[in-house]
């Protein structure tokens, strides 16, 4: 399997060329290319458009720079991450703007030769003052994801839904959210593919989000089975969404390996560990990345070993 890492905390720290060089030297085959960090939260929730996506040139200059660096160092684009949140309560302009950037991101994904994009479900992240019923949320997402089908078909891209969480911002308590129930997640994928008439939707399983909700990673993997086509691999302390390296938090990684073995997962081993990338001085980034790539190779060996070891 190909080993991949997200680029935030690497290319923005080292520069695009040096960042891709470091990714290659560490032993990675692919990158999880992030487009989610260029739309400021304050702009999103107030319905303001951002130049990066809407001036007609900045996004494409950035994508072209990344494409050239990736080609230079032999790095593939394993998946792209679209902007979020995809629903802003009481701000239809903000919701429309973000959903438009998702379509632009699908176009960018196709241009990069990448066949997968991760798009968060549309949901209200506030557990204290929820603005949607479960039925309203489900319909909202079916309509939203269905609207992406023409762009997905045009660019030959699979849209990956992701398991989410929400929080009571007053008490800091974390609650289940859209696609954190694996039966619901499977229902989304199956219904959307039926609407599309082909397999245009899959699932990106986020290990850290499972851990925040005390969900067993093995059970979730087996429940989704071959609907899982991408991964966000990271660890945490079980309380905060830290996005740290595997084995530095409390997730049971043997259960993770067992689950992927059981479903015969053959996709990319992708790390979403930006929470730790920026904690290291840039001089130590190469060493940290090498450890992470070695962890990916270890997972690959264990998942694909002839017998469990």
Question: Positions of the model-derived regions?
Answer:
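N-terminal small/glycine-rich loop or linker at the start of catalytic domains
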Residues: 1-6, 78-88, 124-129
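Glycine-rich, proline-tolerant flexible connector loops at the mouths of alpha/beta enzymes
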Residues: 32-66
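Histidine-acidic metal/acid-base catalytic patches
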Residues: 1-4, 9-27, 37, 99, ...
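Conserved beta-strand positions in the central sheet of alpha/beta enzyme cores
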Residues: 32, 79, 118, 160, ...
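Well-ordered, non-membrane alpha-helical segments in soluble/globular domains
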Residues: 56-64, 139-145, 182, 289-293
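Catalytic-core regions built around general acid/base machinery
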Residues: 52, 56-72, 147-152, 220, ...
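Active-site acidic/histidine proton-transfer and metal-coordination neighborhood
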Residues: 71-72, 86-202, 209-212
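Conserved radical SAM core fold
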Residues: 35-45, 85-87, 124-127, 166-168, ...
